[in-house]
Amino acid sequence: MLSIILVMSLVFLAAVGCSSAGSEDTGTASGTNGDKDKPKKIKIDMMIASWKGGGWPDNNHPIIKYIDDKFNVDLQIQWVPNANFYEKLNVIAASGKLPDVMRIDSPSQYLKWVEEGVFQDLKPQLAQYPHLQSIAKPEEWALLNPKDQIFGIPIYATAQNTIYVRKDWLDKLGIPVPTPDTFTIDQFYDMAKAFTTQDPDGNGKNDTFGFSALGNASLLGMPELFAPFGLANGWKEENGKLIPMQVQSDEWKAFLTFMSRAYKEGVLDKDFVTNTNFNEKYAQGKVGFADMHYQFSQQTNQQLQTIAPGAKFVELAPPMGKDGMRGTPTPTSGTIKVVLSKDVDAEKRDRILQLFDWWVSPEGEDILKNGIENIHYKKNSSGAYEMTDELKAEGEGRQSLLWNWVLRNNSNTFNTYKWSDPTWAKEMEQSIDNAGKYPYKNASDAYLFSSNTYLEKGTALDESFHKTVIEIIAGKKPVESIDEAIKEWKSSGGDQIIEEVNAAYTANP
């Protein structure tokens, strides 16, 4: 279901293998008695979506060569821009020959192809690969799969964004930094209003505000404000039934009363309806609260120094409602999968699973995240690690494309490297841990894409619903008009979506 909260998930991914024995040192396909015992070289075709910067220019990259040598394979990666990935994949599928390995980010595409029988069932072999098996919980392996079958390796996902506040503004206004035990939604509003009305930047102008957002269907910008009012993150479970946020009349009215007041009083950015990028306003020193991840907070703090020396965003727990309800929108591990084509024979399948098992092991993580010593990083004269000139020229993070864009394990150190500043790395990991302390999950993640009505009508229904939400916040409609939007959503297909989602939930709770 289209969640009103767009969790950016930034993120995150990788795939790996080790020997079926699962030891750290034996993740190799080579025999122990010379070349005569060495298994034949196997070609592995992998098709992966690429993001900003694209994939590596060819398959001669040092990490691919390392994998080829270690596992006696010929790894051929086809990088496809994310915007065109499924168009190209469907063309290839129509030809009857899928790549050996793919990453499927679309749950609906995954379910469709599972039903058509185009993927390998990995469950019979999984217990032989302990590193691989350990990257997800049993329910995450089972997600979106038929009972007693596993057609995809689940991608680990975790919350990364949290609420941040301008501490220097708090200090100037004499407001203490709120603690997790005391930070309420009312306190959030009072602080945000002070940022709007008390000239926290001291420039004598009425040009600051409490928080911002995007006036699109997701209302992206401050997702931690939904949970205090009891709104679901898409769907919630109640009394054995899944309920979508679109039918939560009382909760919507409480939330919209809060938001429309914030808009009227200038606490919410007046430009939120037309915003396309509120991040710029953080760096311009106009916003008191922000929703972002640690890495971006540090970049923003650096940018702020040019206009406000000493300015600093610091992390907070999400605010809680009157009943103690609070939450950080949390993605569900397993909705994205790495899959093997059904046409992969047993020998190639086992080699791929050996590779993946090593990939998510500590040894594999070291290579796939940090790169290769003396190529991507080296020790300096003081014994500390630093990037090589080659990696600096290529760009930090380019060495870890397989780790971030294919598959990774469930460690929260995926954005730190051997050469990262130790304090920065520790704070980064702690921030991700903090984001996971207040899980706020979508209860329908395993079932929503089983609804044909949702697949056909869900996006249009939600866009119409959220148009009313935005109009109410902006003062163009009264809060009570949300009931008409709920009625329209239900009668135009929402009731059928609820029925279909709950049928799937009842069949496989």
Predicted regions, residues:
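Bacterial N-terminal signal peptides
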Residues: I4-A14
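Conserved N-terminal structural module of periplasmic/extracytoplasmic solute-binding proteins
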Residues: F12, C18-I185, N233-W235, N239, ...
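Loop/turn elements at helix/coil->beta-strand transitions in domains of secreted/extracellular proteins
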Residues: K40-I44, F71-L75, G96-D100, P146-F151, ...
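Extracytoplasmic/periplasmic substrate-binding proteins
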Residues: S50-P57, D171-T179, G215-L268, F296-T332
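Short helices/loops that flank or line small-molecule/ion binding pockets
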Residues: Y86-L98, Y189-F195, N277-V287
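Helix-loop-helix "hinge/cap" segment bordering the ligand-binding cleft or interdomain interface
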Residues: K147-S218, W235-K281, L340-R351, D357-W358, ...
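Glycine-rich, aromatic-lined ligand/substrate-binding cores of catalytic
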Residues: R261-K264, N279-K312, P318-S400
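Conserved small-residue motifs centered on glycine
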Residues: Q354-E471, K476
